[in-house]
């Protein structure tokens, strides 16, 4: 069984975000287990020390990292994939690890400390995406790749 953990900074998402995440998570069949870990964003204002906030959020993220998982940071500068390339990549990763952990940063992205810990960096787009929407895009992309691997008609 493939385990997919998604660690994301930010909680208290709007209903439409939770609905989108739940919709794609339930589409995966018994062979894949999806787990979402939400880390609350620290309070920000105009006078906030963003470096200090990022450091604290990084510590919370590190504490949430599952042992023995392949860590994949979602980062604008990461590698991007077509749907077919992502299907091939997932097939290859399943040979390496039975647990993939995707990390979604907050408004400032991920700290260098977290990026350094990760085995890979992936990009979903060259666009700057709101981090709540990234959850849905990631799960849809993974589901599409899964459907390609399994010859499911979703991708067609």
From Swiss-Prot:
Organism: Legionella pneumophila (strain Lens)
Function: Specifically methylates the pseudouridine at position 1915 (m3Psi1915) in 23S rRNA.
GO MF annotations in UniProt: rRNA (pseudouridine-N3-)-methyltransferase activity
Taxonomic classification: Bacteria, Pseudomonadati, Pseudomonadota, Gammaproteobacteria, Legionellales
Gene3D superfamilies per record: 3.40.1280.10
Entry EC number(s): 2.1.1.177
Annotated protein name in UniProt: Ribosomal RNA large subunit methyltransferase H
HAMAP family: 23SrRNA_methyltr_H
Keyword Electron transport: no
Subunit structure: Homodimer.
Catalytic activity, reaction form: pseudouridine(1915) in 23S rRNA + S-adenosyl-L-methionine = N(3)-methylpseudouridine(1915) in 23S rRNA + S-adenosyl-L-homocysteine + H(+)
Residue ranges the record marks as coiled coil: none
One term under GO cellular component: cytoplasm
Pfam families associated with the record: SPOUT_MTase (PF02590)
Family from the record: Belongs to the RNA methyltransferase RlmH family.
Keywords associated with the record: Cytoplasm, Methyltransferase, rRNA processing, S-adenosyl-L-methionine, Transferase
Residues annotated for S-adenosyl-L-methionine binding in this entry: 74, 105, 124-129
Keyword Cytoplasm recorded: yes
Domain of life: Bacteria
Cellular compartments annotated: Cytoplasm
């Amino acid at each position: 069984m493939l385990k997919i953990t998604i660690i994301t900074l930010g909680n208290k998402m709007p209903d439409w975000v939770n609905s989108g995440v739940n919709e794609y998570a339930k589409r995966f069949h018994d062979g894949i287990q999806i787990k979402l870990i939400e880390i609350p964003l620290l309070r920000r204002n105009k006078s906030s020390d963003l470096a200090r906030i990022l450091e604290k959020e990084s510590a919370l993220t590190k504490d949430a990292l599952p042992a023995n998982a392949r860590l994949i940071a979602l980062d604008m500068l990461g590698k991007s994939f077509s749907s077919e390339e992502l299907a091939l990549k997932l097939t290859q990763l399943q040979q390496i690890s039975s647990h993939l952990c995707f990390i979604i940063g907050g408004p400032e992205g991920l700290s260098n400390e977290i990026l350094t810990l990760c085995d890979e960096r992936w990009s979903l787009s060259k666009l700057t995406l709101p981090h709540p929407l990234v959850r849905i895009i990631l799960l849809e992309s993974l589901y599409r790749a899964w459907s390609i691997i399994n010859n499911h008609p979703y991708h067609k």
